[in-house]
């Protein structure tokens, strides 16, 4: 098992906490930076990816966003896209300064919602030290994601969002909804099998708080990072789950085709299948082969 150490860095005055997995090499090595998707925390199998990257000769930095997991931030479980972008940039700065890291060979790894984050950050910041991006089952188009929920569910989530916003304006605690639920539940993801699939990501004895402040649903439909694909000039691996019922696949396929150096791989599985065996071995293997060509 790879050596793992607890780390923390500052993002906009608050501590983001995470893990650093150090590659067993004497010379400086590239670093892959990873963070989870919608409401996800690092314990949900990000260490499995990090350990695979370390075995391939790369350092790996995994972190929780502010307001989630072990990181600071009040209120808890507040998903703010701008803040998460700030956290990514803070993580990149921090990783560049870690002992043993080749600061000019940084790769970004995002999954689901963060698969869009890493595209937009790399495309807009144009940081020459970021040399590769991986987006796994990524969110690319907000309108498509909202439409996939159906009109009734979209209205229900919109009402919840306005209720949460009203709470904020009155100084009250957030109005929360669950990130995943059964069909018909008031939750962000309610496709058949989602609840069971997410639980497969839990390590033994770990029970995360799977709620989110509902105000995020006023923003999701407007968040379309796929529009930045044509501006991304570095290698970008896009991995799509063909039977994804949570994140629409067509926008990801379209975005990959627009990127000058986009590479698309489609897997015959569902959204959450990519995290676990047998599809995990296939997807992470493709990621490592991609990194070996780029780093």
Name each model feature, range by range:
Residues 38-51, 65, 250:
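The serine-hydrolase catalytic nucleophile loop
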Residues 245-251:
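Conserved alpha/beta-hydrolase "acid-adjacent" motif
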Residues 232, 238-240:
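Short beta-strand/loop motif that positions the catalytic acidic residue
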Residues 1-27, 81, 276:
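N-terminal cap/lid segment of alpha/beta-hydrolase-fold proteins
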Residues 267-295:
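Catalytic active-site module of serine/aspartate enzymes centered on a nucleophile-bearing elbow/loop
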Residues 41-45, 68-103, 276-283:
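Catalytic nucleophile-loop/oxyanion-hole region of alpha/beta-hydrolase
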Residues 52-72:
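Conserved alpha/beta-hydrolase
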Residues 119-202:
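Alpha/beta-hydrolase-fold enzymes
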């Amino acid at each position: 098992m790879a050596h793992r150490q607890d780390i923390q860095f500052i993002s906009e005055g608050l501590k983001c906490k995470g893990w650093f997995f150090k590659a067993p090499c004497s010379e400086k090595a590239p670093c892959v930076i990873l963070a989870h998707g919608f409401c996800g925390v690092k314990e949900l199998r990000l260490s499995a990816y990090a350990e695979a990257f370390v075995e391939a000769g790369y350092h790996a930095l995994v972190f929780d966003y502010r307001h989630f997991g072990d990181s600071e931030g009040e209120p808890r479980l507040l998903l703010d896209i701008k803040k998460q972008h700030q956290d990514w940039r803070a993580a990149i700065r921090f990783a560049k300064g870690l002992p043993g890291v080749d600061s000019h060979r940084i790769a970004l790894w995002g999954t689901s919602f963060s698969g869009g984050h890493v595209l937009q950050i790399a495309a807009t910041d144009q940081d020459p030290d970021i040399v590769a991006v991986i987006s796994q089952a990524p969110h690319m188009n907000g309108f498509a994601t909202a439409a996939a929920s159906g009109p009734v569910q979209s209205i229900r989530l919109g009402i919840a969002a306005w209720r949460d916003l009203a709470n904020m304006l009155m100084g009250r605690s957030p109005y929360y909804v669950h990130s995943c639920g059964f069909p018909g539940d008031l939750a962000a993801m309610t496709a058949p099998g989602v609840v069971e699939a997410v639980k497969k990501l839990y390590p033994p004895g770990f029970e995360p708080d799977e709620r989110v402040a509902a105000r995020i649903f006023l923003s999701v439909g407007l968040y379309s990072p796929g529009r930045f694909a044509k501006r991304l000039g570095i290698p970008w691996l896009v991995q799509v789950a063909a039977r994804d019922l949570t994140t629409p696949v067509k926008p990801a396929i379209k975005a990959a085709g627009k990127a000058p150096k986009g590479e698309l791989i489609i897997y015959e599985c569902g959204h959450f299948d990519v995290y676990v065996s047998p599809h995990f071995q296939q997807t992470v293997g493709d990621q490592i082969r991609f990194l070996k060509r780029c780093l």
